[in-house]
Amino acid sequence: MQSSSPSPNHSTQVPIKVSHRQFKKRAIRRRRVDLVCGCSYYLHINCSNHGFTHRGTHHCSSSNEWRVYLGNKQSPVFHNHQAPTTTIPAEPGHHNSPGSIQSQPEEGAGDSQMFSQLQDLDDLTASDWSFLKSL
């Protein structure tokens, strides 16, 4: 029986085992990075100069960022920087006294601007309020 396909270029499909074997031979294009907290992530080989923050710690993938954040010998983290000997005086116009407390505006008991357009809020039943709270 002849094929119903008009194109003579159709041939038998490549067996799936052959396809899998071809993909297994390719180089793995990602690298697993284990973090101190126990988490790990996969970094694509071609991905560079991208960082992220996880649990308050900055993680990065470029070699320059690794040097800065993880403490290579040349890392600025480990340089012995001297603290500046002169202090910067506070500007005279600023209020820097630690005892001053800034008062907060009083809260009003009236309608807020958000609900001013709604009518008959006093007529809501307990079931209405429970429904609104569940949202």
From Swiss-Prot:
Broad class of where this protein is predominantly found: host cell
Residue span of motif Nuclear localization signal: 17-32
Composition bias type Polar residues, residue spans: 1-14, 77-88
Keywords: Activator, DNA-binding, Host cytoplasm, Host nucleus, Host-virus interaction, Inhibition of host innate immune response by virus, Metal-binding, Phosphoprotein, Suppressor of RNA silencing, Viral immunoevasion, Zinc, Zinc-finger
Post-translational modifications reported in the UniProt record: Phosphorylated.
Residue span of region Transactivation: 120-135
GO CC list: host cell cytoplasm; host cell nucleus; viral capsid
Residue spans, zinc finger unnamed: 37-54
Keyword Phosphoprotein recorded: yes
One GO molecular-function entry: structural molecule activity
Stretches assigned to coiled coil: none
Location of this chain's protein in the cell: Host nucleus; Host cytoplasm
GO BP term, pick one: symbiont-mediated suppression of host innate immune response
Chain segments carrying region Disordered: 1-23, 77-117
Pfam families registered for this protein in UniProt: Gemini_AL2
Keyword match Iron: no
Quaternary structure, from the entry: Monomer. Homodimer. Homooligomer. Self-interaction correlates with nuclear localization and efficient activation of transcription. Monomers suppress local silencing by interacting with and inactivating host adenosine kinase 2 (ADK2) in the cytoplasm. Interacts with and inhibits host SNF1 kinase. Binds to ssDNA.
Protein function: Strong activator of the late viral genes promoters. Enhances the expression of the capsid protein and nuclear shuttle protein. Acts as a suppressor of RNA-mediated gene silencing, also known as post-transcriptional gene silencing (PTGS), a mechanism of plant viral defense that limits the accumulation of viral RNAs. Suppresses the host RNA silencing by inhibiting adenosine kinase 2 (ADK2), a kinase involved in a general methylation pathway.
Description of its domains: The zinc finger and the transactivation region are involved in PTGS suppression.
Similarity field: Belongs to the geminiviridae transcriptional activator protein family.
Protein name: Transcriptional activator protein
Organism: African cassava mosaic virus (isolate Nigerian)
Lineage: Viruses, Monodnaviria, Shotokuvirae, Cressdnaviricota, Repensiviricetes
